[in-house]
Amino acid sequence: MAALPAESDTSERIKVSIADYAVAEAGTISTSGLGSCLGLAIYDPEAGVSALVHPMLPRRDGNDDRPPERFVDSGIDVVVDALLEHGASKASLRAKIAGGAAVVDFGSDDGDSIGDRNIEVAREELSDRGIELVGEEVGGDCGRTVKVDAATGDVNVSRTDGEETTL
């Protein structure tokens, strides 16, 4: 959706909305308002290119005509394809995730919240694709904002309780 040109100015800030993504080689890619949604960053440290997707639901039904970035599973596919188009190597891809909080209880019958299911699906789908999950700041009941340094893949996570973490 919001795949942006790789030739970004190093001071450029790219904002990713819910059910959207961006890919860049420089600047900062950010998203905010992460409750049960995820901020899923995938990057190639060797190529110096990163992507950030903001999915809100775990899995896409094959008949669903909503944007693939809305879902964790198909959102991963979209950003991997975009990264490969920007020179990344599939073998070098790494991932970091943030979000998945239980801020609203719309849990399933088995007791898992949407946030829990988003986290679980992200871990499964990344593993199935051979993408190493190297950092996460997930769960709990706090909202989050994520900022990705596109050149390095460093992820800064700011929580609504004032805590900050760099992944």
Curated annotation (Swiss-Prot):
E.C. no: 3.5.1.44
Swiss-Prot/TrEMBL catalytic activity: L-glutaminyl-[protein] + H2O = L-glutamyl-[protein] + NH4(+)
GO MF annotation list: protein-glutamine glutaminase activity
Record keywords: Chemotaxis, Hydrolase
Signal sequence range: none
InterPro entries recorded: CheD-like_sf (IPR038592), Chemorcpt_Glu_NH3ase_CheD (IPR005659), Cytotoxic_necrot_fac-like_cat (IPR011324)
UniProt GO BP: chemotaxis
Function: Probably deamidates glutamine residues to glutamate on methyl-accepting chemotaxis receptors (MCPs), playing an important role in chemotaxis.
Family recorded in the similarity comment: Belongs to the CheD family.
PANTHER family noted in UniProt: CHEMORECEPTOR GLUTAMINE DEAMIDASE CHED-RELATED
Protein name: Probable chemoreceptor glutamine deamidase CheD
Species of the source: Natronomonas pharaonis (strain ATCC 35678 / DSM 2160 / CIP 103997 / JCM 8858 / NBRC 14720 / NCIMB 2260 / Gabara)
Gene it is expressed from: cheD
